[in-house]
C-alpha cells in the first residue's frame, strides 16, 4: 500500500511517499481501508519529534515510521475475537500511533465508532480527537447543570466549537474567548451567548461583569 512516512524529525518537507506492506489485524484488531484522515497538533509534534517520551510515557517510534492517529473508512479485515464489528462497516477512530497516513490502518476494535450514513468520512476523521476532548470537558469535568455558565477558551477553534454545542445542548450558558471579531461571529453562530476578544480586554475581568 501507499503511505507517507518520515525518516527524520522536522517539518513537512521530510514526508516521504513510499510503498509499505499491507498491515494485518491481530487478535482484537480490525483493518480499516482509509477514506480520510485527521491532521491534528498531535500529528505535528509526532512528526517534528516534539512529543518526547517524558511527556507521553512511551518511547518515540523508531525511524522511519508512518505517522497519524485519526482516520475514517471501511472495515476490510477482522482479527480473532472481534464480534461486534462487521466487514463493510463505516467507522471512524482515534488511536495514537495507528499510522493513519496510509491507505490502510490496523486499530483495536474497541476504539472504533460507527459512522451514520449521513456523516461523511471527512467529518468522521476530523472530529474524533477534538470531539472526544470536547465530550470529556462537557460531561466529565465540571458537574455542570442546566443554567450554569461555562467559559470556553478558543471558542472558535475545532474543540471550542464542538464544546460550545455540547454545552448548549445541556442547557449551559457559554462565554467564549476569541482573538478576532470574525471568530466572535463564528462562535456565536455555533451557540456562544457572549464572546470576549482577549486581545482587546482582560477576560478574567469581563466574565465578572
Where are these regions (language model features)?
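Adenosine-nucleotide cofactor-binding segment
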Residues: 168-209
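A glycine-rich, Thr/Ser-enriched phosphate-binding loop motif common to dinucleotide/cofactor-binding enzymes
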Residues: 117-140, 146, 153-156, 194
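Residues located in well-ordered beta-strands
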Residues: 2, 16-19, 33, 72-74, ...
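A structural motif shared across PLP-dependent enzymes of the aminotransferase-like
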Residues: 95-109
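N-terminal glycine-rich beta->alpha transition that marks the start or flank
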Residues: 11, 20-72
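A glycine-/small-residue-rich N-terminal strand-loop-strand element
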Residues: 71-97, 171
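N-terminal Rossmann-fold NAD(P) dinucleotide-binding loop
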Residues: 160-161
Amino acid at each position: 500500500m501507499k503511505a507517507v512516512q518520515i525518516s527524520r524529525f522536522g517539518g513537512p518537507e521530510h514526508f516521504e511517499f513510499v510503498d509499505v506492506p499491507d498491515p494485518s489485524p491481530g487478535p482484537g484488531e480490525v483493518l480499516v481501508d482509509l477514506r480520510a484522515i485527521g491532521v491534528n497538533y498531535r500529528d505535528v509534534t509526532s512528526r517534528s519529534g516534539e512529543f518526547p517520551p517524558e511527556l507521553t510515557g512511551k518511547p518515540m517510534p523508531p525511524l522511519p515510521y508512518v505517522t497519524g492517529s485519526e482516520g475514517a473508512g471501511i472495515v476490510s479485515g477482522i482479527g480473532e475475537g472481534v464480534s461486534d464489528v462487521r466487514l463493510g462497516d463505516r467507522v471512524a477512530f482515534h488511536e495514537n500511533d495507528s499510522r493513519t497516513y496510509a491507505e490502510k490502518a490496523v486499530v483495536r476494535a474497541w476504539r472504533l465508532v460507527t459512522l451514520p450514513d449521513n456523516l461523511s468520512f471527512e467529518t468522521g476523521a476530523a472530529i474524533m480527537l477534538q470531539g472526544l476532548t470536547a465530550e470529556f470537558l462537557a460531561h466529565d469535568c465540571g458537574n455542570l447543570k442546566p443554567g450554569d455558565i461555562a467559559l470556553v477558551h478558543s471558542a472558535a477553534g475545532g474543540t471550542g466549537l464542538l464544546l460550545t454545542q455540547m454545552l448548549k445542548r445541556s442547557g449551559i450558558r457559554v462565554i467564549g474567548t476569541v482573538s478576532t471579531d470574525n471568530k466572535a461571529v463564528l462562535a456565536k453562530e455555533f451557540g456562544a451567548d457572549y464572546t470576549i476578544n482577549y486581545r482587546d480586554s482582560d477576560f478574567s475581568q469581563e466574565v465578572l461583569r
